[in-house]
Swiss-Prot record:
Transmembrane segments: none annotated. A lipid is attached at G2 (N-myristoyl glycine). It comes from Rattus norvegicus (Rat). It is a lipid-anchor. Its main location: Golgi. This is ADP-ribosylation factor 4. The keyword Transmembrane does not apply. The gene is Arf4. InterPro entries: Arf1-5-like, P-loop_NTPase, Small_GTP-bd, Small_GTPase_ARF, Small_GTPase_ARF/SAR. GTP binds at residues 24-31, 67-71, 126-129.
């Protein structure tokens, strides 16, 4: 009985811990997103060599977000962050039509990893404020998301510099992860 009340109390008032891995090609906006969520402001960023890790508290959930550099030479290191990842945020520059196929290949390869088989996928279609940005339907098609089987995924249009769509994405992520 004490355990039941204790677990109910912790569900109502405690913070649930979530491990989130945020990856994507270089210059997609991962670090800008991380610090917009953490600090509520835009910070000047430089290309991430290695990783940034921050705790973001939102709606009674404590997200530990790992932002890992996206340059092609760093990508093989991503696998070191896969273990115990519950949610995967893949950030795509919606305006970068020249590299969307590269992004699709990187994403598809990563989703084959055993350690990520249970992770839900949130795709941030970033830089939606730019005039040449791909629509969500076009991006979904070019990334091959419709072919994903046995994977819970969602695409959220975002603009990291304005903060648009970021919390809507976290809402989806927290709803999906709290079902587990």
């Amino acid at each position: 009985m004490g355990l039941t009340i204790s677990s109910l109390f912790s569900r109502l008032f405690g913070k649930k811990q979530m491990r989130i891995l945020m990856v994507g090609l270089d210059a997609a906006g991962k670090t800008t997103i991380l610090y917009k969520l953490k600090l509520g402001e835009i910070v000047t960023t430089i290309p991430t060599i290695g990783f940034n890790v921050e705790t973001v508290e939102y709606k009674n959930i404590c997200f530990t977000v790992w932002d890992v550099g996206g340059q092609d030479k760093i990508r093989p290191l991503w696998r070191h962050y896969f273990q115990n990842t519950q949610g995967l945020i893949f950030v795509v520059d919606s305006n970068d039509r020249e590299r969307i196929q590269e992004g699709a290949a990187v994403l598809q390869k990563m989703l084959l990893e055993d350690e990520l088989q249970d992770a839900v996928l949130l795709l941030f279609a970033n830089k939606q404020d730019l005039p040449n940005a791909m629509a969500i339907s076009e991006m979904t098609d070019k990334l091959g998301l419709q072919s994903l089987r046995n994977r819970t995924w969602y695409v959220q249009a975002t603009c990291a510099t304005q903060g648009t769509g970021l919390y809507e994405g976290l809402d989806w992520l927290s709803n999906e992860l709290s079902k587990r």
